[in-house]
Amino acid sequence: NLLVSNGAARSDGTHYGWFENNESGMAWKLRFKNERMIKAETWKPSGEPCYWTKKGIGVVHFYNEDGTKWRIDFYKRGKIVSRKYQRKGSIHGPWTTWYENRQKSSEENYKNGKIHGIWTKWRIDGEKRGGKHYKEGQRHGVENTWYPSGQMAMESKWKDDQLISSVAWKPNGQKCPDTNVQD
């Protein structure tokens, strides 16, 4: 069994924790300044360090006793890019992303590695950009997109990943001509 501490905090803003049976002894060490993560070092249960991507995005893994883990990707300045949960190597649960200005970019949910539920996207200014419904990896339900003005751009209906109907509007709100959906 792998046991992970809840960690501790020092007055300099460093938070740290450890795996009891980890070769290196350390699981994670995070440094905060003004409530913002400025440095992160993490290790897998094997003692192998976690990494930075080629795009300069930091990656932190936290492992739970039940074998699940959650992953946080962050910008170099410590602001979170995304947070997702994994179970048995597959994404499972919520996956949320943010712009560097801390505005939420997207929110989606996964079930055993397949997108399941509502997927919502926002623009960098916080205005809703679109939303889709999924059922076990397939589009199922209503899909909407909006213009930056907030005007509806499109509404489509899906069933088992097959398009049933779609209506589109011009930026001025005028409905576009009907189009038939064919197999």
Language model features with spans:
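Glycine/tyrosine- and acidic-biased, solvent-exposed loop/turn segments at the edges of beta-strands
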Residues: N1-D183
